Amino acid sequence: MPKNMAALQQSLYTGPSTPSHTQFSRSTEFPENLNFDVLNDSYETFSSVSLTTAEQDNQIDKILQESAAMNRDVNSELAQFTASEYVTGFRADTMEPEVIVETIGDSMKRKASELDSDSDSGESSKGKKRVIKPKMRQRYKKATIQNKTSLTEECNYNTEICTVAPTDQIAEYFKHDFSVYLEKQKSDCQMSANRFSDYISETGYYVFVVKKSEHKPFEVVFAKFVNNVTNEYTNNYYMVDNRVFVVSLNNVKFMVSYKLVREQGIDIPPHVNLCDDAQAERNPYDCYFEPVKNVFQTTLINHFHLDMYYSQTTFVTLMQSMGESKSGMLLNKLYQMFQDRSLFTLPIMLSRKEPTIENTPLSRNYTSSYVAQIIKYSKNVRFPENNPDNGVISRLEEIVTQKSSLTYKYSSVANLLFSRYGHQRDNNADSLKKVKKEDGNRLLVEQYMSQNENDETSHNFIVLQFGGVNDERLTIAKKGIEFFWIAAEIKDINVDDLVKKYTRNVHHVFRIINVNRRESTTWHNNLLKLLQLLLQNLIRIDDVQQYSNKGDSKFIYKRL
């Protein structure tokens, strides 16, 4: 065999090794204008030509030289690309702050810090590891997908999914009435696909301003598409009203004028945290924003027709991002479904956790075991009676806010309310420790109230938790014909509306305000301690009213 023949045979079928880097694809793509017939002819011609030993050696040397040159070029390009990528890194807007890992003994300490300079000194970086990773920014709302779930049995409650049409009909629609149109649909150009992808991943907000109008009761004006809503309003719309209710509907923000809401006669919840008129006038360039939710949000949406503005904005922007062809298909299909009324059987679902009770004649008089136990075990118990104590009244704030071992278990609250103040073991509520607490819902509240509203002598209470992780709490205590309510903002319960149903009784409502979730839990316990003093007559309602009127108070009181 001629010299270097083995190398020649290998070079005919394998080129220089491809660098292992993500810039180079493992698959091979051929140009569209590549003529395989010419390649085959050239290969057959080359294989049929007989060469002398010297000519073969010259060809081998030439191929090896070209292979070496190609290898050098590839390595050079790879080195330049790697260096460029190292210097450039990720874009600034996709980076999250550096994560510095400090090694201290055998423990690892992590902390996030911002980049204060382009480079760090050798001493500052000694013993530290910098880990830079891209930040995946969520859109509007974080949603966690569990890695593992288990099937659990829940006897008392289920999550009711309400749909207009049965599930099998909805599945049939998507299988036969919708998918067949998609198979005939031609995809739009790549530009339309990019627009839809950008629309879905967009994190900005469409801002609308709801304000007074000279010619009509109010008007809703589109302001701008921005990333910072409060800055946009403060810079350009502060003259409309420097007190604003913010209604957030996904990526649409409605900035509703406080003055407009008040002039329209809409009831503003007492827990809303906005400055008074005097402060707003003293600082006209300072804007105050109050995010609204739950019942008050529903009221504003309904009164100012914000659902229509949101739907039109979302629908138009979505159709624009999908392109003309697909949008036309959807519009035609939606119009047909509107005409035959099948549009309203789409899977629009609302979920609410309620007891699994059928609406039958036998179940209408149903009482939950929780309420039944409260009524049963509280028949012969009474809150301790005392006379107003000036020493307690003068130290009211100190007593209410001091730390205690109180928990939100029924037995713990019973021990607090029925134990004589200052004598923890002196109580007549041992029987109440048998009560088994249940998760809260609207039906439980109504059952408790209906079972107690006509009883003018009993003393008892109920503690309820809503929302799972959110831990929204509601406590109702009964003393004769009076009910005492302790609550913050609860998503599924409107305390004021519930109170209005039971006009035979006197209702004292303690509403927690101006606090976050953790502080709300703390202040619920504080108000339970306040309730103990009130139920045992150690303080008067006037003392509670005076305490709630303090400037830094975390709750408000009202009698209904």
Swiss-Prot record:
Top-rank lineage group of the source organism: Viruses
Protein function: Regulatory transcriptional protein, which trans-activates gene expression from early baculovirus promoters. Can also trans-activate its own promoter, suggesting that it is autoregulated during normal infection of insect cells.
Family: Belongs to the nucleopolyhedrovirus IE-1 protein family.
Pfam families: TATR
UniProt name for this protein: Trans-activating transcriptional regulatory protein
Keywords: Early protein, Transcription, Transcription regulation
The keyword Transcription regulation belongs to this UniProt entry's keyword annotation: yes
A single BP term in Gene Ontology: viral genome replication
Residue ranges of the region described as Disordered: 106-133
